A protein has these predicted regions:
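Structured mid-domain segments that build the active-site/substrate or prosthetic-cofactor binding neighborhood
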Residues: 1-66
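Acidic, low-complexity N-terminal propeptides/linkers enriched in Ser/Thr/Asp/Gly that mediate export
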Residues: 37-176
Length: 176
């Protein structure tokens, strides 16, 4: 194909959910279409959650243990009052920092912020990394005697997310 096509397209999660809903419907109505438009289910979250679940060791305690419990029963609906949605997004934010932060920090803080601001690229790359389990981004270059695995990075990201949420909202998870 001789023409340039930008890589800046939206994550397909929203259209995947809309298509899923439309394919399951018979006899459309205004109310049904409203429910499709107001649907807050994230196929991206549903796709990523099983990878997060696999990192639970059973040795977690406190809010970290509760976080895994919330994530295990979460249906991927991004309700404003959902503790699991908050934990998921805090985990994803920390995952991005833990995957890319060590390399991009070498260029300066502005580079990390600029890259993480490109949500479309970041989500697409995370999907690729999770599908293959491989990427040079996974290894933390600041730990020369250890090559991190994707599960280690995910586990660290969940733990970092809980620390971040406790610092922001306190240790009582019901206040999150």
């Amino acid at each position: 194909f001789p023409y340039y096509i930008s890589g800046f397209w939206a994550d397909p999660s929203r259209i995947e959910q809309i298509n899923r809903r439309l394919d399951s419907m018979d006899n459309m109505s205004v109310e049904k279409m409203k429910s499709v438009q107001l649907d807050q289910t994230s196929p991206f979250a549903q796709e990523i959650l099983p990878f997060i679940w696999l990192t639970e060791t059973g040795e977690e305690t406190g809010n970290l243990k509760r976080a895994y419990e919330f994530l295990k029963v979460w249906d991927g609906v991004e309700d404003v009052d959902s503790e699991a949605a908050l934990i998921f997004h805090a985990t994803m934010r920390n995952l991005v920092l833990n995957l890319y932060g060590d390399e991009l920090a070498l260029l300066g803080q502005n580079y990390l912020e600029a890259y993480t601001g490109l949500k479309y690229l970041v989500h697409r790359k995370i999907r690729e990394i999770f599908k293959t389990g491989e990427s040079s981004w996974i290894d933390n270059i600041t730990t020369p005697n250890h090559v991190e695995t994707l599960n280690e990075i995910i586990s660290k990201s969940v733990a970092d997310a809980i620390i971040e949420l406790e610092e922001s909202f306190g240790i009582n998870i019901s206040n999150w």
